[in-house]
Design a protein with these regions (language model features):
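A short, surface-exposed alpha-helical micro-motif characterized by mixed small hydrophobic
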Residues: 209-211, 477-479
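ABC ATPase C-loop
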Residues: 159-160, 423, 429-430
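ABC ATPase NBD Q-loop/coupling interface
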Residues: 57, 68-83, 350-359, 363-371
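Conserved ABC ATPase "signature" region
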Residues: 120-138, 389-401, 424
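ABC ATPase nucleotide-binding domains
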Residues: 235-294, 508-545
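H-loop/switch region of ABC-family ATPase nucleotide-binding domains
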Residues: 203-204, 471-472
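Catalytic Walker B motif of ABC-type/P-loop ATPase nucleotide-binding domains
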Residues: 167-170, 436-439
Length: 545
């Protein structure tokens, strides 16, 4: 009998200075070749479990640990990340903290050099993993010129280049555009099916990955709350924690259709079987700039921004024309490297266009893509002193973490801390900027925390501040935005109402939009109304016969 690639017995762990256990008596086996999805709310223990499986807990983070854990046949309490590195690959939630080399090629060669691979073997492995992740064009780039999504691809490639027995991934699609995210899940499925690589993938956006998994585990308060098949998990989530259910599962639940579908393909097949034919998608997304008259919060006029990516200068923004009105809520979307972060940095005055202009007449506050850029203290409470800080911590659900080190928080908790810092800073200044820019703020956030972010954005909007959020999260954009601006190659390629843009695209579309085609529905609530209407019509036709 083959031993599990991960074996955990009664594992309890607490970070230094933490007030509570992050893992509490947890037991788990992962078999060779399994594809396991870890679900759970922010702070439920997913990140800590992955850190324990690769030795970062306790060897890097310290803290108190009890129980037993083995990974790839090694006792993790006696063997740290260096010993486990050949057999266990990790993609952390914050790739900027994981990438250590100057160039992309050097980063990918590093794990192979540590195993004394020959130059020829290193070259072949690097070329193959770069092709698999569609990133040969990045190999000679310097890492400090990469976008967040590009950096995440590099971290993925470095984890996969040595073909480990076990790959641990902590929200690996959080900074990837929908195309790259789908490609990644396809690659993981191929590694799993063709090479027998065990995959443990922690995700909040489960609609992307459940169909590829053999098994789904839900965590809560450092324990396993559910362990079963993806379909059983969706049924459990709808009954016990609907925030964990996929949009497609919520769509079917609201429409009174069961069982919940695992993925878009299965959902469409189930609807066809019931005679509820999805409407086929039509056309391209619109180009309809805003006509809202509230005064400009952001104006970009023929703006060109040039950056040196390590291989020479290139135009990141190419004569961009864009306008955001006061009080608007706008989602800025586009593939990795399309220019989203560059536009936000230009709006905040951190980059100057070579020609043209980008201006925020009422001022601009920016939450950067890397939340760690905002942390300068060793305690969460010290990052947010005073009444405004306490209120901001309570608003994001981190009041319990005042004594913790920001570095010990999960990725979602760090993201929430960064949001709290921006919220508290705005309150302390007493002046509301005309434009609030957030760069990928939903990374690591569960649905409940995303709802909190949406409520905060709507409050700012009601006070006449524009909120511009760069995001790859189409489900969040559908809930947050009134309008979507879609960038491609530094130019605006679509600009219009959120329902039109996110219902009309192939990749930049919500799960409900992909299930129901060109119906115009992008959220489960409206989609369920359409399905109920179709059911009534079908019943009427059947009765008439």
């Amino acid at each position: 009998m083959v031993d599990p690639v991960v074996r955990i017995r009664r594992l309890t762990y607490r970070y230094p200075s933490a007030a509570r256990d992050s893992l509490a008596g947890l037991g788990l086996d992962v078999e060779p070749g399994e594809f396991v999805v870890l679900a759970g709310r922010s702070g439920s223990g997913k990140t800590t479990l992955l850190r324990a499986c690769c030795g970062l807990v306790p060897h890097y983070h310290g803290g108190d640990v009890a129980g037993a854990i083995e990974a790839a046949g090694l006792d993790v309490r006696d063997h740290g990340p260096a010993d486990l590195g050949a057999a266990v690959g990790l993609v952390a939630q914050d790739p900027e903290t994981q990438v250590v080399s100057t160039t992309v090629r050097a980063e990918l060669e590093l794990p192979l050099e540590m195993r004394s691979e020959s130059a020829a073997a290193r070259a072949r492995a690097v070329e193959e993993v770069a092709l698999a992740l569609a990133m040969p064009h990045l190999l000679d780039r310097t890492v400090d010129t990469l976008s967040g999504g590009e950096l995440q691809r590099v971290a993925l490639a470095a984890a996969l280049v040595g073909r480990p027995r076990l790959v641990l991934l902590d929200e690996p699609t959080s900074q990837l555009d929908p195309v790259a995210g789908d490609e990644l899940i396809g690659l993981l499925r191929r590694l799993n099916e063709e090479w027998g690589t065990a995959i443990v993938l922690a995700e909040h956006r489960l609609e992307r990955c459940l169909a590829a998994a053999d098994r789904a585990i839900a965590m809560a308060d450092g324990r396993i709350a559910f362990d079963g098949s993806p379909r059983e998990f969706l049924r459990w989530a709808l009954d016990h924690d609907p925030a964990l259910a996929t949009p497609g599962a919520r769509l079917f639940e609201l429409a009174g259709i069961g069982p919940p579908p695992v993925g878009v393909k299965e959902a469409r097949q189930m609807l066809r079987h019931r005679g509820l034919e999805p409407i086929e998608a039509s056309g391209q997304p619109p180009l309809q700039p805003s006509t809202r008259a509230g005064g400009p919060a952001l104006v970009a006029g023929d703006a060109w921004v040039e950056l040196d990516d390590g291989t020479g200068p290139r135009d990141v923004l190419r004569g961009i024309e864009a306008r955001v009105e006061c009080g608007e809520r706008v989602a800025l979307m586009g593939r990795n490297g399309a220019g989203k972060t560059t536009l936000l940095r230009a709006a905040a005055g951190r980059l100057r266009p070579a020609r043209g202009r980008v201006a925020a007449p009422g001022g601009c506050a920016l939450l950067p893509q890397s939340p760690g850029d905002l942390f300068v203290r060793e305690r969460v409470g010290d990052e947010l002193p005073g009444e405004a800080g306490t209120a901001a911590l309570e608003a994001v659900g981190l009041d319990w973490a005042a004594a913790a080190d920001p570095r010990d928080l999960s990725g979602g908790e760090r993201q929430r801390l960064a949001l709290a810092i921006v919220m508290a800073g705005r309150g302390a200044e007493g002046v509301l900027p005309g434009l609030i820019c957030l760069d990928e703020p939903t990374r690591g956030l569960d649905r409940a925390r995303k709802d909190t972010l949406v409520a905060w954005a709507k409050d700012l909007s009601a006070r006449d501040a524009a909120v511009l959020i760069a995001t790859h999260d189409t489900e969040f954009a559908a809930s947050f935005a009134e309008r979507v601006v879609l960038l491609g190659d530094g130019e605006v390629i679509a600009d219009g109402p959120v329902a039109e843009v996110l219902a009309g695209g192939w990749y930049f579309a919500t799960e409900v939009a992909r299930i129901l085609g060109a119906s115009g529905a992008i959220l489960p609530e409206r989609g369920a109304e359409i399905l109920r209407e179709l059911s009534v019509r079908r019943a009427e036709v059947t009765e008439a016969r």
